[in-house]
């Protein structure tokens, strides 16, 4: 599932680290 969020992390990357 970790690869599933890498698809929309561009907007949540700030706290998705």
From Swiss-Prot:
Note: On the 2D-gel the determined pI of this protein is: 6.9, its MW is: 45 kDa.
Alphabetically ordered keywords of this record: Glycoprotein
Known tissue expression: Chorionic epithelium (trophectoderm) and placental cotyledons.
Lineage: Eukaryota, Metazoa, Chordata, Craniata, Vertebrata
Name of protein: Unknown placental glycoprotein 45J1
Description of post-translational modifications: Glycosylated.
Domain of life: Eukaryota
UniProt source species: Bison bonasus (European bison)
